[in-house]
Amino acid sequence: MNDLARRHFVRAGLAAGALSVVPPFARAQQATLKVVWMGWPDNQVLPLMAEFEKRNPSIKLAVERMPFTQLFQALEVRLNGRTSDPDIFIVDSPLTASYAARGHLMELDPLIDKSRFSAGALAAGQFNGKIYSAPFGSSMQVLYYNKAMFKAAGIEPPAPDLAKRWTWEQLVDAGRKMAKPAENIWGFTFEQQERPYQLLPLGQSLGGKALSDDGLKATGFIDGPAFVEAFTFMQKMYTEWKISPPGQFDTALTPELFGSGKCAMLLGGTFINDTLKSKFQNLDFGIAPHPYFAKGKPVTPTGAWHFGVNPRSPQKAATAQFVRDMLSDDMNVAWFKLRPYVPTVKAVWQREAAMFNSDLWRIAQAELDSTALPRPATPGFREYEDILRVALRDMQAGGSVAQALTGAAQKMDRELAKYK
């Protein structure tokens, strides 16, 4: 165990011990919790917080919502001040290890019944085998396809059945028959063209491992044969087969490309479904599972917004009640209805079966239970992601895949060394 982790376990052990004996919040007590949350619209946040206060009249929530572009930097400044503000804060799940290793998250194992949650969601909130961020929502990628474009090309579309999941090779073959690059018509696009969340599953499908088990070494992992092969295949989508639009790094533009009939297939999040239906009402599209390599295995990305407890908060009973209540079945149903992230609580799928009676949600639930793999747990995820994003852009532009990955791995190792 490295010194950073050892120091952290001493702090976390004391905090966890305190939490394990925290009683339910007494109504006679009064508390105000400072909460930093994502800057989602009023109608997706305020009803949830109001419901918590209604259920817990002795606890008031002072909620500060921050836009995505400011959230991470603002949290860094505040948490590095090592004060009790905020008591509760939103956590992008791959940053769990980073926050936990630096002593910014309370261990939550005493408050969470692991049997209630999907395995992938729990894994996304863990560091060194302990839960540090509460799994409040997950994500899943599905393959959207334009039925009219498939029909015009005489191609049988993929089925909404995991047992009949398309391979990447099948996808490219179909995409080449529908792409017309000179006319800005494309066969396929990733929603997030240069983000590890979207693209790591390609190498993982071939058995690749994105990082060492301790999250501190990239060389020999992200630059290994599986990722070189997978990202060479990805590169050819742009440079040789020309089925994918180059340079589309704005995640708001790729759904537009698909919705406007300029792209036959889009690999994107479940949340895009509602956008496509509302914004492109004449678009006739179908949904199928995430592809995999013929000689590999299916792997899908997962992870989304969690929340955590500041271990320096003096409001132990109130923060514990926030965790318990927000992770209840009722509150998770309410949260899904406000903002439909993939549910992490198993009971939600059963309680709201009618809502999930569609290809989209049947696929998402099945993937979450069988193929979902969170991003690698490392205290240096921000550095890891930034370096890999640059390398992915270079590869898509035609640069040497092996050289790009070797260089990226070396840079990652230098950055991750500071956490040893």
What are these regions (language model features)?
Residues M1-G17:
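N-terminal secretory signal peptides and thylakoid transit peptides that target proteins
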Residues Y132-F136, Q141, T167-T219, A226, ...:
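Extracytoplasmic/periplasmic solute-binding protein
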